[in-house]
Amino acid sequence: MGDFDGEQKELIKKLVNFRMIDGKRTRVRAIVYKTFHRLARTERDVIKLMVDAVDNIKPICEVVKVGVAGTIYDVPGIVARDRQQTLAIRWILGAAFKRRISYRISLEKCSFAEILDAYRKRGISRKRRENLHGLASTNRSFAHFRWW
């Protein structure tokens, strides 16, 4: 990981760690770098594209289930910065896996397509973010139950 700043290194490390299955880090790192090479064909600065894609998917608010007097409410709340990035990466990778199952193509191509869609504010992960924000705005009347 050449001349990246701390935040960019952390993003790449999270990408690798979230995708890793059975501790096969070198295999996953190769997939991530192949995805970056595909992205480099379309855009000059791959890391900036990745950071922008994650920023476009980051949720601002989320809902938490809270039980009050025997009733369960979806209570909206603000998401911490680290959790925003974690959720965004998790959603992008989940959408790539979903594409892989649907279309039967390689994981590099699916990741490439989903990252580009996230950068362009489209795709499965962006839709998931919009659904979460819609749920939070629908349940904003229960915000007074937020005491954690």
Swiss-Prot record:
Q: By its UniProt entry, which CDD domains does this protein fall under?
A: uS7_plant
Q: Which PANTHER family match?
A: RIBOSOMAL PROTEIN S7
Sorted alphabetically, which Pfam families does this protein's record hold? Ribosomal_S7 (PF00177)
Q: Please describe what this protein does.
A: One of the primary rRNA binding proteins, it binds directly to 18S rRNA where it nucleates assembly of the head domain of the small subunit.
Indicate where this protein resides in the cell. Answer: Mitochondrion
Q: Which GO terms describe its biological process?
A: translation
The GO cellular component terms are: mitochondrial small ribosomal subunit
> What is the protein's name according to its record?
Small ribosomal subunit protein uS7m
Which species? Triticum aestivum
GO molecular function annotations of the record: rRNA binding; structural constituent of ribosome
Q: What UniProt keywords apply to this chain's record, in alphabetical order?
A: Mitochondrion, Ribonucleoprotein, Ribosomal protein, RNA-binding, rRNA-binding
Protein family according to the UniProt entry? Belongs to the universal ribosomal protein uS7 family.
Q: Which domain of life is it from?
A: Eukaryota
Tell me, how does this one assemble?
A: Part of the small ribosomal subunit.
Gene field: RPS7
